[in-house]
Each structure stands twice: as structure tokens, then as C-alpha cells.
């Protein structure tokens, strides 16, 4: 019966957001939120997005369903943006955001016989929940030394022994959340070779294309992996790259042998039908309009370049700080919005209670959430607690 349902604990990040909003201090800083913020602390709508919406408002003739696969032109354009020419051989379906794409992919892997999903840890906190909801077993594979801020490839590849043939592994393509630590091209090759040797299916999570080094640069490693493995699943989110978080724009791509593609598509369609039936259109239509119009595409890329430059500039300023023995200099080499600092629970609590600086309990910070004027205060607060 419904009245017997247990009370679930709130999402830790939502708890932090609530605490920040209720904090009366005017000099507080929210470094926990997972969205991009500009130098003024706002998350603006991109100019190209606004212009595309104007085009859609004037030209759209109907609000009927776009079809179960979704907007095929959107899928083609997003596939080309992420994977280049190889995307023409991928099966694709529009999804309800990146999270929806991850769930679709996990359900597909379960249908194919997978029982476990390896998660290089620490991972995005929602990955394990999605995996469990798909009735798969999430298995952590430690791969990062937070104290030294470096990837441990031996630990990662050694952890592949925890999986069996046909199991999967979720690997973030770029701008790792929560670490900001990306693999080199050579490391991507090593990962691909190790996955092939064990028969593990790569599940690439691409959510921050353009936030690291550039549109093509951010997916260069993932493309290398996809060229070397026979099968793969790829979840794509356009929430961050286009600043359209609430529109829930995602897609799932599957690399499979040609003879298997009809079965892949039929299974994806069945999974989608039982979950949400038809995907939403507005956000995907925005992305399609931007990517298919030369002027809008140029405007979008220019603004994305500005976002990336802002993040890199903040990283350089943080890296120049001296905070006791903390290896702050390595923050400059990390990519995207997030980094995880070597802080314990007591230090995270002290930053929040004594200095009004909010971050997740794991000490993940959103670099883009730190305004330039607040950097000196943040550094001094770190010195006080570290």
C-alpha cells in the first residue's frame, strides 16, 4: 500500500542548495550548484538560443509528435558534432536529457545480457542510482588520487577484472564531473585495448562538449576509443553546451555491427515507449536550428568560446594560489566546471559554517560558480581550514 512507502533521503546536492538559499549572509558563495555561471553569477540564455527560438516561433506549424526516434535532423547534427563521420554508422534515438539517455543505455545493456556497470570512482553521484534503477549492479573502480590530483591508470585497468564479458563501463568523455581530470589520447587507447581484451562494453557519457579545450578537442579521446572498440553506447547531453538545462535535451547513440542495428533500434524504441513514449521537441529543435544555420552556429561557438575562456581564467587564478600543502597548481590543467579538493568532511563543514562557502560533501567545487572578486576570500578560507 502507498502509506507503507519509506521516506527517502533528499538528494545531497539539493540539500546544499536549500541551505545556501536559507543562509542570510550576503558574502556567501555557492560552489555546489552544477550549472555554468558567468562573471556576474548568472546563467544567461545564449544569444543563438534566443534567436533560434524566434525562428521556431515564427515557423513552427504544429505541436504534434515528432516520432518515437525523435528529431532525426537533430540526431544527425549532434552525432556529427560529437563523433564526425563515424556517427553515420551509429543507431540513434532522442532522449529526455542526458540522464534519460543514460537510463536508456543502461536498460539496453541489461537487455543485451549485462549484469554490472563499472563506474570509475569518484563518479557523477547520479550514475550509481541510474544503474541500480535499470536493475544492474554498479561497481566502483577507484582511478583517481585526490590528494595528488592525478589519474591512476593501473588501478583503473586493474579494476576491469571486476566485470565479466558483456558488462559495461561508464566513462566520461571530457570535463569530468566531479574531478575535472581527463584522459590523454594514449590513456584512451589503453582503455580501449583493455576493454576489448575483457569484452567490456564502453558506455561514454558526453555532457560538457566545448567546456574543456574546444568542440573537437574535447571529444578527440572518445573518438579514438570509439574507433577501436566493436561496440559502444554513448549518452549525449546538450544542456550545458547550449545552456538549455531545463529543456532536457539528450540523445543516445549505439555503435554496433550493421546486422545488429535493426534489433538495437527496435529495443531502444520499446524501452522508450514504456518509459516516456515520445521525446520533447522544443530543446532539440533549438539545437537543430542553431547547428543547421551558419550564422547561429558561429554565434553559438563564439559564446561557447567565451564560457570556456572564463572557466580557464578562473582555474589559472586558483592555481596561482598557495594553500598550505594543497596542490592547487594542478587545477589549471583540469578541464571544465568541476574540481574536487583534498578536503575532509570537517573542513567542508567549516567552510560552510564559518565562511559561507558551500560545496558538496565530497569537496567538489564548481569553478564557474566562483566570481573573480570572491577568489581571494575563497583562498583565505581554504588556508584557514586546510
For each predicted feature, which ranges?
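N-terminal "arm"/small-domain region of PLP-dependent enzymes with the aminotransferase-like
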Residues: 1-66, 80, 274, 280, ...
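Active-site PLP attachment segment
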Residues: 221-263
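Conserved PLP-binding catalytic core of the aspartate aminotransferase-like
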Residues: 300-353
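Hydrophobic beta-strand scaffold residues
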Residues: 138, 202, 232, 358-359
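Conserved Walker B
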Residues: 206-207
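Conserved PLP cofactor-binding pocket of PLP-dependent enzymes
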Residues: 30, 330-344, 355-373
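Conserved core of the PLP fold type I
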Residues: 54-55, 61-196, 210-211, 219-227, ...
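Structural signature of PLP-dependent enzymes
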Residues: 265-284, 290-319
Amino acid at each position: 500500500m502507498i502509506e507503507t512507502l519509506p521516506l527517502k533521503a533528499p538528494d545531497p546536492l539539493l540539500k546544499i542548495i536549500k541551505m545556501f538559499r536559507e543562509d542570510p549572509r550576503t558574502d556567501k558563495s555557492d560552489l555546489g550548484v552544477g550549472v555554468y555561471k558567468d562573471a556576474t553569477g548568472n546563467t544567461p540564455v545564449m544569444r543563438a538560443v534566443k534567436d533560434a527560438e524566434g525562428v521556431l516561433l515564427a515557423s513552427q506549424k504544429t505541436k504534434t509528435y515528432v516520432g518515437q526516434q525523435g528529431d532525426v535532423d537533430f540526431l544527425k547534427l549532434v552525432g556529427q558534432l560529437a563523433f564526425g563521420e563515424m556517427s553515420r554508422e551509429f543507431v540513434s534515438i532522442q532522449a529526455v536529457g542526458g540522464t534519460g539517455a543514460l537510463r536508456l543505455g543502461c536498460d539496453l545493456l541489461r537487455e543485451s545480457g549485462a549484469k554490472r556497470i563499472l563506474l570509475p570512482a569518484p563518479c557523477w553521484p547520479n550514475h550509481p542510482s541510474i544503474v541500480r534503477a535499470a536493475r544492474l549492479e554498479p561497481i566502483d573502480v577507484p582511478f583517481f588520487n585526490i590528494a595528488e590530483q592525478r589519474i591512476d591508470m593501473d588501478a583503473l585497468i586493474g579494476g576491469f577484472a571486476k566485470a565479466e564479458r558483456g558488462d559495461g563501463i561508464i566513462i566520461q568523455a571530457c570535463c569530468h564531473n566531479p574531478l575535472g581530470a581527463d584522459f590523454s589520447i594514449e590513456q584512451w587507447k589503453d582503455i580501449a585495448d583493455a576493454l576489448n581484451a575483457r569484452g567490456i562494453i564502453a558506455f561514454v557519457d558526453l555532457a560538457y562538449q566545448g567546456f574543456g579545450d574546444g568542440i573537437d578537442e574535447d571529444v578527440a579521446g572518445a573518438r579514438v576509443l570509439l574507433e577501436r572498440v566493436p561496440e559502444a553506447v554513448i549518452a549525449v547531453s546538450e544542456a550545458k553546451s547550449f545552456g538549455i538545462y531545463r529543456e532536457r535535451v539528450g540523445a543516445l547513440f549505439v555503435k554496433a555491427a550493421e546486422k545488429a542495428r535493426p534489433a538495437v533500434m527496435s529495443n531502444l524504441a520499446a524501452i522508450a515507449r514504456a518509459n516516456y513514449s515520445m521525446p520533447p521537441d522544443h530543446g532539440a529543435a533549438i539545437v537543430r536550428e542553431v547547428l543547421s544555420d551558419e550564422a547561429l552556429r558561429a554565434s553559438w561557438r563564439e559564446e561557447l568560446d567565451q564560457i570556456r575562456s572564463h572557466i580557464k581564467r578562473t582555474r589559472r587564478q586558483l592555481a596561482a594560489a598557495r594553500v598550505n600543502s594543497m596542490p592547487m597548481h594542478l587545477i589549471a590543467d583540469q578541464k571544465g566546471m568541476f574540481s574536487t579538493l583534498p578536503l575532509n568532511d570537517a573542513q567542508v563543514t567549516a567552510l560552510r559554517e564559518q565562511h559561507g562557502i558551500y560545496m558538496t560533501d565530497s569537496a567538489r567545487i564548481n569553478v564557474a560558480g566562483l566570481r573573480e572578486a570572491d577568489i581571494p576570500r575563497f583562498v583565505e578560507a581554504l588556508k584557514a581550514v586546510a
